[in-house]
């Protein structure tokens, strides 16, 4: 993680300079959003304060992570800690200097916000009771965590047409909505062997769409090969021009 941390730490002062340009009126809110989202930061309505979003792969937070977020909230007088629908956590009402301090301390303590917004692989979500749920097919948490780490390891390298969401569900209840996300993995058992069903090209929002089932069962130990291949498919074939609602259209037309 040393090399990753060094790279992420080196980005902070450039981000601070962008933030100061925004605060001084030299940069529009939309232009700032285009740059800040990938850093895990968004300007709030006042135009003077900011929100940060922490990556919590599979919705799992260690006691160390939670204590650090609690410490940030107390230190910077944040009244509410917001838990997102993708199992990340947010702090609001921060100054630019506070944001940069959180970035630096978080990186040094391996709590990251990089890539939690913008056109990047977002927080990997998973069934909330993975590992302890009575009716789960098998524990999907290790695989969701591995994918989250895979994305984080090269988070600063991505150039995507749109944000990229990955989800894991541990049974047919599909609590993580793998059938309506960019890339979804559903745990199944076939002939006594553990596999994942793979779903592609779904999404929620104003233009919701169900995913396409790939028709192939994959072995859990091969999960990163498939994640990397499908991420590259998204990069190479996704639509960079039409806009967010249709970014998967060129891909799904070819495979449906």
Q: For each predicted feature, which ranges?
A:
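Gly/Thr-rich phosphate-binding loop signature of adenosyl cofactor/nucleotide-binding cores
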Residues: 1-70
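Mobile "lid/hinge" segments at catalytic clefts and subdomain interfaces of large enzymes
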Residues: 2, 158-244
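Small-residue-enriched alpha-helical segments and adjacent helix-cap loops
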Residues: 23-27, 49-193, 225
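Short, flexible, solvent-exposed loop/turn segments with mixed acidic/basic and small polar residues
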Residues: 41-46, 77-83, 236-241
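Non-catalytic alpha-helical coupling and interface elements of nucleotide-dependent molecular machines
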Residues: 111, 235-236, 252
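Intrinsic, low-complexity polybasic segments
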Residues: 153, 245-246
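Positively charged, low-complexity/disordered segments
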Residues: 248-256
């Amino acid at each position: 993680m040393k090399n990753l941390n060094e790279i992420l730490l080196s980005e902070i002062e450039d981000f601070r300079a962008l933030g100061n340009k925004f605060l001084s009126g030299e940069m529009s809110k939309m232009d700032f959003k285009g740059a800040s989202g990938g850093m895990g930061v968004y300007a709030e309505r006042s135009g003077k304060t900011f929100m940060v979003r922490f990556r919590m792969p599979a919705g799992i937070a260690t006691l160390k992570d939670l204590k650090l977020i609690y410490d940030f909230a107390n230190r910077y007088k944040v009244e509410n800690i917001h838990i997102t629908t993708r199992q990340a956590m947010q702090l609001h009402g921060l100054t630019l200097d506070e944001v940069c301090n959180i970035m630096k301390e978080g990186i040094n303590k391996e709590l990251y916000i990089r890539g939690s917004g913008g056109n990047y692989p977002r927080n990997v979500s998973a069934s909330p009771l993975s590992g302890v749920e009575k009716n789960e097919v098998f524990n999907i948490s290790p695989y969701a965590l591995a994918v989250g780490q895979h994305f984080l390891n090269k988070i600063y390298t991505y150039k995507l047409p749109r944000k990229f969401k990955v989800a894991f569900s541990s049974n047919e209840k599909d609590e993580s909505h793998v059938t309506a996300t960019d890339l979804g993995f559903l745990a199944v058992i076939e002939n006594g062997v553990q596999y994942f069903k793979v779903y592609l090209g779904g999404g929620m929002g104003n233009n919701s769409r169900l995913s396409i089932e790939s028709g192939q069962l994959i072995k859990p130990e091969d999960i990163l090969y498939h994640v990397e291949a499908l991420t590259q498919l998204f990069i190479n074939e996704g639509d960079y021009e039409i806009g967010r609602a249709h970014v998967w259209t060129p891909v799904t037309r070819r495979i449906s």
